Amino acid sequence: MASIDFRNKINWHRRYRSPQGVKTEHEILRIFESDRGRIINSPAIRRLQQKTQVFPLERNAAVRTRLTHSMEVQQVGRYIAKEILSRLKEQNRLEEYGLDALTGPFESIVEMACLMHDIGNPPFGHFGEAAINDWFRQRLHPEDAESQPLTHDRCVVSSLRLQEGEENLNDIRRKVRQDICHFEGNAQGIRLVHTLMRMNLTWAQVGGILKYTRPAWWRGPVPDSHHYLMKKPGYYLSEEKYIARLRKELQLAPYSRFPLTWIMEAADDISYCVADLEDAVEKRIFSVEQLYHHLYHAWGHHEKDSLFELVVGNAWEKSRANTLSRSTEDQFFMYLRVNTLNKLVPYAAQRFIDNLPQIFAGTFNQALLEDASGFSRLLELYKNVAVEHVFSHPDVEQLELQGYRVISGLLDIYQPLLSLSLNDFRELVEKERLKRFPIESRLFQKLSTRHRLAYVEVVSKLPTDSAEYPVLEYYYRCRLIQDYISGMTDLYAWDEYRRLMAVEQ
């Protein structure tokens, strides 16, 4: 196995206008400080304040949004990164691993990956994702393109139907149909950072948010060696060339992951498990006492000094000992969070170090907190109680169904733009308004300028006389609609749906 040298992974170069003549530790750190500024000041981060964590359209500011959740993940990620570096320093291995001059960038990449990890999520979270994918599947039917051309291909777009004698073009059609029907928040995050926002971040920083390594157009089973890393789509066909360059710059083998991404993932796992339960208590779905009993019974067999007693039991006893009963909730979650972090962060850090050869190679095929340990069991306990008692609550399910309907309805509203012929849509893009298409013209005007420009830029580079042109033009037109709707906040999507459905003035 190749030696571990993080100087080959923490690549501070950029896709465009890359800094030259960088030599000192301070100069390298300044480059990553620039990344921090670009990320923190980006509109994509600001929009997280009105996107769902668990409870859509929530007016109670004490309940988490995607932004407050991401800030908490950022802090936990920083904690894990510092713990890793501290342990490596104690073992005199920082220099051996090429980290002696890169501790600052190491921490910064992890922090900013944590802050960005949800930026691609659509309104209403996973139900927004499901709505987008279901809507496009019902029109493109990618499963009908799996075999040789079918006489009963249900795809409503003629240019995407498989044709006899067009093997190469049919491969592209299959890719496009599969890709469009696999919208995913992590893949959209890559697209936002590179294509839409043009943030021009360092290669290492973007590597930190490439959580899954499966292309969205992938068909068939994934290799056993990468089944975890490829369990979801990680990037789209539209970013294929960029990801290929990213892999080259970060020395990543096909379908392998950037090492620091495991830290971001662990920070997210630790953060949301406790946060979801705290938000449920804030929403009065259950009381702290009820939550404790849910956790107690779900744990199963109890022993003195078990991990449950050291973490959950300790938090419960300390919160009850507080004479200010009105603060029991705050006290319980403060102790629960502290106890959880004090157990899981050192464990995650040690797992990273113990498995560093595989992690550095990008092939460690599981999460840091996914094993047979009691620490993994504790996280699963939090998740299972949330699934059983929070996500299945009627109020939560009703909001999720409303979110699904809103996103589906918005796609229905913008569908006329996808129904235009290639020539008609091209003319609409050039002139921005066409008298013979009054509805389509008004819908086109509502699209974000940023998204329209991204479409124009990529389509203008396609050779118009090639057989691929109609297929790829339609692909990028679908991306345009997905970009616009997925970029909305929950409140904007809700209001836009009501306005366009004439529910309110």
UniProtKB/Swiss-Prot annotation:
CDD domains: HDc. One of its GO terms (biological process) is dGTP catabolic process. Residues 66-273 form the HD domain. SUPFAM superfamilies: HD-domain/PDEase-like (SSF109604). GO terms for molecular function: dGTPase activity; magnesium ion binding. The keyword Hydrolase applies. Its cofactor is Mg(2+). Its EC number is 3.1.5.1. It catalyses: dGTP + H2O = 2'-deoxyguanosine + triphosphate + H(+). It comes from the Bacteria. Keywords: Hydrolase, Magnesium. It holds the Pfam family HD. Homotetramer. dGTPase preferentially hydrolyzes dGTP over the other canonical NTPs. Belongs to the dGTPase family. Type 1 subfamily. This is Deoxyguanosinetriphosphate triphosphohydrolase. It comes from Salmonella choleraesuis (strain SC-B67).
